[in-house]
């Protein structure tokens, strides 16, 4: 699969807002402090963006790390209807927008569409409790808009505390119309950690957004860190939302049965996007010991309307291909279950060896062999889609 290459003009836009990195060791130290905060090694502080050092660290490192993550679920959403946004105004709202990371990822992705598939204009709303974050979001998107006059952008920034103030905020945000996309990127993990009854509050936040913000034909994109705890929390939230019947899952799941990753305590389901890390990210990784050689995250695409039913032979790849002695194995998900599919190396087919986490694959000709499945003679393996790379 081709690597994702971070756009050079976006690096220039981000660099103009972040300012000169200065001493890279000091920048790396601030990135390390943010990492400890985000993974729970230090107590949560929602106001980290108020620190100039932490703001620069986030813009220089975490913004380019997180921006591409929204583009994979967007591609999954568009796969069913490539002209979904064509020639009309697209409205999107980002809940807990930070410095506009996901919105910048959205508009970057939109400009890469074929001209016939692009929206005529984009109306964005960014909600965050940090004044500093919203200032950065406005500056970044203003610079981006200046480079893409063919796709007019308009941004409205709203400062509020989502959990406490959304009953007043959501009707105001939707005053000009409901949204085609509601984005919640790296938000629910903060709600779970920061507030009492955090899991229930996170669930209610998305349910409320579906009721008050989302257009009937729209989608909610949820992106969470690819850690076991945060991914499994998202699996539990998925099951809760689907059980209540207001939302349906369009990706990555091919079914609406309870998530099979929760059948054990050790499993979780994430995406893994291969990329070429920008030089500043690679250098900070070297200085801190962080590893962003690929981008791991959990995501859901949810919508009020049900998706198309997957064929019985369609599976989602939920692991890397495991190279064992004499055979290769891979985990697949569909129909409410995970299975292990094995292929002997002496029977190896290129398509099997080339499978990657996140692929949709059509498999004709599997047979159960004890606890696992094997490809039968004459079986056919066909990759339907690959995780998008730019």
What are these regions (language model features)?
Residues 1-45:
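N-terminal auxiliary segments of SAM/dcSAM-dependent transferases
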Residues 44-82:
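Class I SAM-dependent methyltransferase Rossmann-like catalytic core
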Residues 99-117:
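Conserved SAM-binding loop of SAM-dependent methyltransferases across substrates and taxa
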Residues 135-173:
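S-adenosyl-L-methionine
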Residues 179-199:
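A short SAM/SAH-binding and catalytic strip from SAM-dependent methyltransferases
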Residues 200-217:
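A short glycine-rich, Lys/Arg-flanked "PGG" loop and its adjoining helix->strand segment in the class I
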Residues 216-224:
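Conserved beta-strand signature within the Rossmann-like core of class I S-adenosyl-L-methionine
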Residues 279-390:
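C-terminal lobe and adjacent flexible extensions of AdoMet/dcAdoMet transferase-like proteins
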